C-alpha cells in the first residue's frame, strides 16, 4: 500500500475514536484508578504498570488522555493492516478490512477506558505480530513466545486474537485450494501458546501475584458454568446490537458471505473445504467468548 493510503486509514481511525475524546468521561475502572491510584497487579498484568509508568515518565499511574485513546487507535489500525495484508491480495479489501479490529463493536468498550485502552491495544498488536514471520517457523516460534508473553502480561484476553489470526489464515488456505488443514501452523501456534502461558504462570507464581481476576476459564464444572454465562451474555450483546440498527450492517455482510460461498460452489470448489472454512469461521467467533 502506498503511504497516502496508509495515512488515509490512520485518519479514519482517529476520526472514529474522536467522539470518545469529545465525550471526556471516566469509564468504570477509570474512576477507581483516578481516585485510588491502583494499578493492574491484582489482574496479573505485570507489564501494565511498567508501561504506564514509562508513558508517564516515572510519575506513577496517571492518565495521558486523550493521547492514550488516539495512540490506541493508531496501534489497532497497525494491527489491522498486518492482518489484512496477510489475508487479502485485493488492495481495496486490504484498505477496508484493516479497520475491522478498531471498529469492532466489542473493541469500542475497550477504547472507552482512559488508562487501559493503550495496554489492550499493545496486547492485541503483540498477538498479531508473530504471524509476519509465519513462513520461517523458528523465527515464528521465537516471536510468538515473546509476543504472547507480553500479551499475557498486558491483557490476557487479547491472546485469543493469536488463534483468531491462525484460523483466518486457515480459512484463506481453504478458499485458495491450499492446505485445508495446516498441521504445522496449528501445532506451532498451539505449542507457542502453551509454552508462553506456562512461563507466564511461573512468572506470576514467582512474583507471588495474587490473581483477583482475569484468569482463564478452568476445565471443570465451574468453568462450564462460566462458558454458559458468557454465551448468555454475548447473546444479550448481539441482541442489543441487532435491535440498535446494527442489523443493517450485519445482514449485508451475511448475504455477501453466503453469495461468495454459492459462487465458489458453482465454480466447482470442494464442498469439504468450504465446510471446513465455515468451521474455522465459527471458531473465530467462539474465541471471542472463551477467554
Features from the language model and the residues they span:
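Transmembrane-helix motifs of polytopic, lipid-linked glycan transferases
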Residues: 70-91, 129, 260-266
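Start-transfer (signal-anchor) and selected internal transmembrane alpha helices
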Residues: 1-15
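Transmembrane-helix signature of polytopic, membrane-embedded enzymes
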Residues: 83-106, 125, 138-139
Amino acid at each position: 500500500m502506498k503511504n497516502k493510503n496508509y495515512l488515509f486509514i490512520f485518519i479514519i481511525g482517529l476520526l472514529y475514536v474522536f467522539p470518545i475524546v469529545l465525550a471526556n468521561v471516566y469509564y468504570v475502572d477509570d474512576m477507581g484508578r483516578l481516585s485510588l491510584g491502583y494499578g493492574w497487579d491484582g489482574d496479573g498484568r505485570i507489564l501494565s504498570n511498567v508501561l504506564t509508568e514509562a508513558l508517564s515518565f516515572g510519575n506513577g499511574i496517571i492518565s495521558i488522555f486523550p493521547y492514550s485513546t488516539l495512540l490506541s487507535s493508531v496501534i489497532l489500525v497497525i494491527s489491522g493492516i498486518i492482518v489484512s495484508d496477510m489475508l487479502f491480495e485485493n488492495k481495496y479489501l486490504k484498505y477496508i478490512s484493516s479497520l475491522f479490529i478498531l471498529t469492532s463493536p466489542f473493541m469500542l468498550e475497550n477504547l472507552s477506558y482512559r488508562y487501559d485502552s493503550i495496554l489492550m491495544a499493545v496486547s492485541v498488536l503483540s498477538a498479531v505480530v508473530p504471524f509476519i514471520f509465519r513462513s520461517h517457523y523458528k523465527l515464528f516460534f521465537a516471536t510468538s513466545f515473546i509476543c504472547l508473553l507480553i500479551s499475557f502480561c498486558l491483557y490476557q484476553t487479547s491472546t485469543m486474537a493469536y488463534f483468531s489470526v491462525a484460523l483466518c489464515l486457515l480459512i484463506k488456505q481453504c478458499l485458495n485450494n491450499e492446505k485445508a488443514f495446516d498441521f504445522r501452523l496449528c501445532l506451532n501456534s498451539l505449542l507457542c501458546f502453551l509454552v508462553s502461558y506456562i512461563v507466564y504462570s511461573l512468572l506470576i507464581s514467582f512474583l507471588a501475584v495474587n490473581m483477583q481476576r482475569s484468569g482463564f476459564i478452568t476445565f471443570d464444572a465451574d468453568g462450564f458454568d462460566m462458558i454458559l454465562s458468557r454465551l448468555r451474555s454475548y447473546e444479550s450483546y448481539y441482541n442489543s446490537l441487532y435491535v440498535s440498527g446494527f442489523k443493517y450492517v450485519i445482514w449485508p455482510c451475511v448475504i455477501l458471505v453466503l453469495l461468495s460461498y454459492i459462487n465458489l460452489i458453482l465454480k466447482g470448489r470442494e464442498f469439504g473445504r468450504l465446510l471446513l472454512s465455515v468451521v474455522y469461521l465459527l471458531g473465530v467467533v467462539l474465541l471471542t467468548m472463551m477467554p
